């Protein structure tokens, strides 16, 4: 069970996130303003650099902050969800969190359309998130829910999928993520087989179709489709696996990690040109939670 327990996360404190690939996060801000009109209001946004983003919000529009957070702070970034495979998926998650009444993924939860009477803006946002993490396609992503401010930590009303993590601690972007592609350390060479270990057919266009194990000592060579079907053996009705065991060495595999390894082996350059572009109005969209009407008693 992945339901939150403060004692569980106490041993999962992390002061940095050292990922080999990209960092895409969707965060929740809470206003600490002394002005009662703004105090407690919330903001949902997307970022690739949480430390820089909260600084921009608190400095204001002239320094890259959003119009709707300007002069309504100071703001705290209380939590962030990360582990999205790319910025597109993260932005879709952000939009649904901002607009639960418009998201087709959340149409089975009409109670999310309005903030309840006497419910705080944070509690409303947290209630939306709790439901989102149990809905496809997000419930099949290897997401991490990270608490950034311990005063806001609380249990989820529903158990999260087992492959998701709940941790606490600040986020910093590691140097390896900021390294230019031409400075990147290449992964060790792989001794590929000429045939797929699952279908026993020859690997045609291996650069496009081939996947291997994340265990560097394992020589697993498979077509992407073959390995996906193998990992989906116990999950009929799905097309993209969450993970499973390697058919050769029985290493526990994450589908997201397999695809990331494939990109590294191919030398696909990281899309660093987008890493500092979370400042535009198209990306930095307010959730308008402060104007959300309440349900009557």
UniProtKB/Swiss-Prot annotation:
GO annotations of cellular component type:
Slx1-Slx4 complex
Q: Which UniProt keywords apply?
A: DNA damage, DNA recombination, DNA repair, Endonuclease, Hydrolase, Metal-binding, Nuclease, Nucleus, Zinc, Zinc-finger
Primary location class:
nucleus
ZnF (SLX1-type) intervals: 196-249
Where in the chain are disulfide-linked cysteines found?
none
**PROSITE patterns in the record, alphabetically?**
GIY_YIG (PS50164)
Query: EC number(s) in its UniProt entry?
Result: 3.1.-.-
A Pfam family hit: GIY-YIG
The entry lists its GO molecular-function terms as: 5'-flap endonuclease activity; crossover junction DNA endonuclease activity; DNA endonuclease activity; zinc ion binding
Record-linked InterPro entries: GIY-YIG_endonuc, GIY-YIG_endonuc_sf, Slx1, SLX1_C, SLX1_endonuclease, Znf_RING/FYVE/PHD
Q: Which CDD domains match?
A: GIY-YIG_SLX1
The chain positions of domain GIY-YIG read 22-108
* One GO BP annotation of this record: double-strand break repair via homologous recombination
Question: What are its cofactors?
Answer: a divalent metal cation
Q: Look at the named UniProt entry and state the broad enzyme category this protein falls under.
A: hydrolase
Q: Where in the cell is it found?
A: Nucleus
Q: Which residue ranges are recorded for the region named Disordered?
A: 275-297
| Family the UniProt entry places it in | Belongs to the SLX1 family.
Q: How does it assemble?
A: Forms a heterodimer with mus312/SLX4.
Function summary: Catalytic subunit of a heterodimeric structure-specific endonuclease that resolves DNA secondary structures generated during DNA repair and recombination. Has endonuclease activity towards branched DNA substrates, introducing single-strand cuts in duplex DNA close to junctions with ss-DNA.
Question: What HAMAP family does the database record attribute to this sequence?
Answer: Endonuc_su_Slx1
Q: What is this protein called?
A: Structure-specific endonuclease subunit SLX1 homolog
Gene that this polypeptide is encoded by: slx1
